[in-house]
């Protein structure tokens, strides 16, 4: 008899959704400086678009300041332009091969907008988790229909898949609440 559904594989896929969510919310700017803020920035370099961290070193020298050290002097202008055009509301100050980026205080409107974006990311992750759950439930129904597992085993595994889904979604909610608190903190 087959086991019906690979719970480890479902857990791995659900954990992937959590990892993607953590990465998404890490790029949201809060009151404190973080190199992750510049993750979405891509630079036109050497004939293609590259992530900023592949053409420069990003550090956090102060609580409200980022420092970007561009490796190739000819790329400084492109890096500055990419940061300005990134819709992050940042204005880099060029200092030789370095760019200093002061992070402005977030106003209430911008904070609420960031919280909304965080909620969108959370919803996207929850949908991904529910798709994984649906795939698992479909596999269980097929295994039961094909006679690979009995009705009782199918029901038991179905409950395990549901519990796993509930746990992952509550973890996403917890991460969202933490990020929301961090964003709204003045």
From Swiss-Prot:
Keywords, alphabetical: Cytoplasm, Protein biosynthesis
GO-annotated molecular function: ribosomal large subunit binding
InterPro entries, per database record: Ribosome_recyc_fac (IPR002661), Ribosome_recyc_fac_dom (IPR023584), RRF_sf (IPR036191)
Any Gene Ontology biological process: cytoplasmic translational termination
A Pfam family reported for this protein in Swiss-Prot or TrEMBL: RRF
Location of the protein in the cell: Cytoplasm
Keyword Iron set for record: no
Annotated GO CC locations: cytosol
Primary localisation category: cytoplasm
Top-level taxonomic group: Bacteria
Region (Disordered): 135-164
Functional note: Responsible for the release of ribosomes from messenger RNA at the termination of protein biosynthesis. May increase the efficiency of translation by recycling ribosomes from one round of translation to another.
Stored PANTHER family: MITOCHONDRIAL RIBOSOME RECYCLING FACTOR PSEUDO 1, RIBOSOME RECYCLING FACTOR
NCBIfam families attached to this UniProt entry: frr (TIGR00496)
Similarity comment: Belongs to the RRF family.
Protein name, per record: Ribosome-recycling factor
Annotated organism of origin: Sinorhizobium medicae (strain WSM419)
Gene that this sequence comes from: frr
